[in-house]
């Protein structure tokens, strides 16, 4: 297990108080699910390229940063260029990023998608971090890099004035990262990340984020039924107004598939920022989820007119439970499946109430009373008398 710090950097004026440091997206405590595209839209462009970032229509894009031999931060996931790069003739190239100069590495072309021999050369070249910041202005980027590269990365951000655009995700011990950042003129706020399956550590991470006035916490586990999915963990994040971040793209994804089934499951456990390899599909899922939320909210509004005195108690109690659940889900964090199921349940109970009300009226109309018995007897006697009269008249 490991603990990582995600550092969120914002503009100078905001650094006076930690609680005010987070970007507007991070501070958005509405029910909206946010999307983070891992390495950009690498399904349709080279990973960690300017093109891949620009193609993304989502809330965040996470990219990997390495530093060249001459101290220039560039976008690259691996320690080497072997998997993702070729020369101008399409020939394979090799070497560690840390042993190549920027002049050398900037001439390399990127293979399409996630690289490898099966992917062809593209026109995209390895971009520097400075180039990425300049050409993708307006897109919030999560930068994954080593603590040892902090100075090089930080200087680029500082020079570009790109603090509102950037979130740092730094591997390292909490005390080491905090010490390194405390030496900076601008000290960004931080969001704790915990990967593991110890409930005490999960709760401690959330408590630490909450006490620091932070708005996001990232949790991961390799256990399919891990403690990060416990209801009390979800409740703790919600009561602290902290958004849960979950990555579907690494080994700490609790064995969830990066598809609508996995997203639905993770979101149903309270996580509202999802890192994915399929941002377009996740955006579509979220659109469908919001449609389900709107439909449920409209049904909840209509159901507010039902009054307990008008209906059988047993059915109304079931209705009220379903109504309260639907009310909570329509205004809070919920998956598409949760919203759809809540709608179906509430709609069904509304129908039961309507039928029960109709049945009640029919039973009242048919209720046996002394007066109705006398009336029925008199009617029957009248019918019999009429029949006798007509029979005798016919005989004459």
Segments and roles (model prediction):
Residues 1, 12-15, 322:
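Generic detector of short, well-ordered, non-transmembrane alpha-helical segments enriched
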Residues 1-7, 376:
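Sec-dependent N-terminal signal peptides
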Residues 5, 75, 365-366:
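Short beta-strand element of the conserved SAM-dependent methyltransferase core
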Residues 7-15, 381-388:
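Hydrophobic alpha-helical membrane-insertion segments, chiefly the h-region
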Residues 8-291:
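Phosphate-group recognition and catalysis centered on beta-loop-alpha active-site segments
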Residues 289-379, 383-395:
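Beta-rich interaction/scaffold domains
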């Amino acid at each position: 297990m490991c603990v990582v710090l995600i550092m969120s950097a914002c503009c100078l004026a905001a650094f006076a108080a930690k609680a005010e440091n987070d970007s507007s997206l991070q501070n958005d405590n509405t029910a909206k699910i946010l999307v983070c595209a891992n390495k950009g839209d690498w399904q349709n462009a080279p990973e960690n390229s300017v093109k891949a970032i620009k193609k993304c229509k989502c809330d965040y894009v996470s990219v990997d940063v390495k530093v060249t031999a001459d101290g220039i931060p560039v976008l690259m996931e691996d320690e080497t260029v072997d998997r993702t790069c070729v020369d101008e003739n399409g020939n394979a190239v090799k070497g560690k990023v840390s042993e190549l100069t920027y002049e050398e590495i900037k001439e390399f072309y990127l293979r399409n998608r996630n690289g490898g021999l099966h992917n062809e050369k593209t026109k995209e070249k390895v971009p520097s971090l400075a180039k990425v910041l300049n050409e993708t202005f307006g897109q919030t980027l999560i930068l994954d890099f080593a603590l040892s590269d902090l100075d090089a990365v930080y200087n680029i951000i500082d020079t570009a004035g790109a603090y509102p655009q950037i979130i740092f995700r730094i591997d390292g011990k909490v005390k080491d990262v905090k010490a390194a950042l405390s030496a900076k003129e601008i000290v960004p706020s931080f969001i704790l990340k915990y990967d593991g399956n110890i409930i005490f550590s999960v709760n401690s991470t959330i408590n630490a984020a909450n006490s620091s006035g932070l708005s996001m916490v990232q949790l991961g586990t390799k256990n399919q039924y891990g403690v990060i999915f416990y209801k009390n963990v979800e409740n703790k994040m919600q009561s602290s107004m902290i958004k849960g971040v979950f990555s579907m793209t690494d080994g700490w994804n609790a064995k969830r598939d990066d598809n609508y089934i996995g997203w639905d499951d993770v979101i149903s456990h309270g996580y509202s920022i999802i890192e994915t390899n399929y941002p377009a599909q996740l955006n579509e899922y979220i659109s469908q989820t919001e449609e389900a939320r709107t439909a449920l909210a409209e049904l909840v509004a209509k159901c507010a007119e039902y009054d307990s005195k008008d209906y059988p108690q047993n059915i109304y109690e079931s209705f009220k439970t379903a109504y309260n659940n639907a009310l909570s889900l329509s205004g809070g964090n919920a998956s598409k499946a949760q919203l759809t199921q809540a709608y179906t349940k509430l709609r069904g109970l509304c129908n039961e109430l309507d039928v029960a009300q109709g049945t009640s009226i029919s039973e009242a109309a048919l209720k046996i009373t002394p007066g109705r018995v006398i009336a029925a007897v008199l009617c029957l006697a009248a019918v019999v008398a009429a029949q006798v009269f007509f029979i005798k008249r016919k005989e004459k």
